[in-house]
């Protein structure tokens, strides 16, 4: 504390012993020790206070550094905010200018022109609506199968066979020598062959 060595302490003790004597030396030693102890305590307290003050100063310095960095960051944020606001204002001005230019370039239709356009467009709308309705009706109408009428068969003209002449018996030899008459009957394509009577059969039936 006081930078006193061992030799110096020995010298002080010898001087005190000579000056004070052996009777007063113990009291003087206790008194000196008490004052030395108080001086150390006082020095320790001062030292602690100095250390506390130094720590406080360091804390203050660190706090000031932090505050300075925060201020710098705040200034940077403000600058960026101002730049963003300026860019937004410039963009808004450009957009509003373009809108004004387009609005001035686009002709404004008068009410008479609008009415004329609506009147000219109404027949087209009606025609389109009629075509749409017709197409819908064609799609929804049911398909009805109609039977075709059957044409009647052509009437067949029946020609009666000629009356066979009844010849008496005495003239049988003359009939035998004479050629037999052949009855010509018109034959229709649709008449079956079984329905046509033959002339010889009728002659034989009518002979007695």
Curated annotation (Swiss-Prot):
Keywords: Cell inner membrane, Cell membrane, Membrane, Protein transport, Translocation, Transmembrane, Transmembrane helix, Transport. The chain crosses the membrane at residues 1-21. One of its GO terms (molecular function) is protein transmembrane transporter activity. The keyword Magnesium does not apply. One of its GO terms (biological process) is protein transport by the Tat complex. It is a single-pass membrane protein. It is found in: Cell inner membrane. GO terms for cellular component: TAT protein transport complex. Residues 188-208 are annotated as: Disordered. InterPro entries: TatA/B/E, TatB. It comes from the Bacteria. Its main location: membrane. The keyword ATP-binding does not apply. The Tat system comprises two distinct complexes: a TatABC complex, containing multiple copies of TatA, TatB and TatC subunits, and a separate TatA complex, containing only TatA subunits. Substrates initially bind to the TatABC complex, which probably triggers association of the separate TatA complex to form the active translocon. Part of the twin-arginine translocation (Tat) system that transports large folded proteins containing a characteristic twin-arginine motif in their signal peptide across membranes. Together with TatC, TatB is part of a receptor directly interacting with Tat signal peptides. TatB may form an oligomeric binding site that transiently accommodates folded Tat precursor proteins before their translocation. NCBIfam families: PRK04654.1, tatB. Belongs to the TatB family. This is Sec-independent protein translocase protein TatB.
């Amino acid at each position: 504390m006081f930078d006193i060595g061992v030799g110096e302490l020995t010298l002080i003790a010898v001087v005190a012993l000579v000056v004070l004597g052996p009777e007063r030396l113990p009291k003087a030693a206790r008194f000196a020790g008490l004052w030395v102890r108080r001086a150390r305590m006082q020095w320790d307290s001062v030292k602690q206070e100095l250390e506390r003050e130094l720590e406080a100063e360091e804390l203050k310095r660190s706090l000031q550094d932090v505050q300075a960095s925060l201020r710098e960051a705040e200034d940077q944020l403000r600058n960026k905010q101002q730049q963003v606001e300026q860019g937004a204002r410039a963009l808004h001005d450009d957009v509003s200018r373009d809108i004004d230019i387009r609005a001035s370039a686009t002709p404004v239709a008068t009410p008479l022109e609008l009415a004329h356009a609506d009147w000219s467009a109404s027949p087209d709308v009606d025609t389109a609506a009629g075509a749409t309705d017709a197409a819908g009706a064609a799609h929804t109408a049911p398909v009805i199968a109609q039977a075709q009428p059957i044409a009647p068969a052509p009437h067949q003209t029946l020609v009666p066979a000629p009356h066979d002449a009844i010849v008496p018996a005495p003239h049988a030899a003359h009939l035998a020598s004479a050629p037999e008459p052949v009855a010509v009957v018109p034959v229709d394509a649709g008449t079956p062959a079984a329905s046509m009577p033959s002339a010889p059969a009728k002659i034989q039936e009518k002979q007695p």
